[in-house]
Amino acid sequence: MKWKTLLFLLLPPLMAWGQKDKDKGKAIQSLGTKQAHYTDVAKQIWGFAEMGYLEEKSSALLQGELSKAGFEIEKGVAGIPTAFIATYGSGKPIIGILGEFDALPGLSQEAFVPERKAILEGAPGHGCGHNLFGTGSLAAAVEVKNWLAQNKVPGTIRFYGTPAEEAGDAKVFMVRAGLFNGVDAVVSWHAADRNSAGPSTNLATKSGVFRFYGVAAHAAAAPERGRSALDGVEAMDMMVNMMR
């Protein structure tokens, strides 16, 4: 994990407090000295490779790192055992940093191997870089915390440990529980093939379940009495495509 990648997550919270360029340079240098440690954290989460809502080891590792750095930990928020909030400081602004750490099914893979080579065939793996996601957010939160403490600046940095991003919608439950109320800004990042600030937007999704019920009838004697559930599915598919 290149530590410079963390800079793009680190700068928005620091700019919220009006940090000077020389202080940004110090933050970058500080991250460089901790590169090996954060790389080890990312490797551990890679090895855990835990599915959504089951990230017990990954969540505990991140909580432990934040606790050692001086954050207060609130565990099991929104009724989710692996969700947590780590907070440092007081007053405004309140800056949130998202950290994800869940894996995907069937993507077990040995690290640093360019070809497909599962650690355990059929087991989960980090196909979307969430081992880096959680670790990078951890590093940024700790560095901002250190800056607040060293400069005696009022403000709050809040790390949101958000499990089950891939399919479990844990953030939705966290929002509904009011855990983001009063936050002035929330920043996030994602592992990619380049280092850049991403101003682009993404479409949101809202899931739902649709059931179609048919009516049975004799195909030869009374076909007019039958109703095909498949007809409804096909009609909906066609009309949704037309709406797009």
Task: List each language-model region with its residue ranges.
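Short, functionally important structural connectors and interaction interfaces within domains
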Residues: 3, 23, 43, 93, ...
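Acidic/His- and Gly-rich active-site-bordering loop/insert found
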Residues: 20-126, 135-155
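Enrichment for repetitive, rod-forming helical segments
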Residues: 9-11, 133, 137
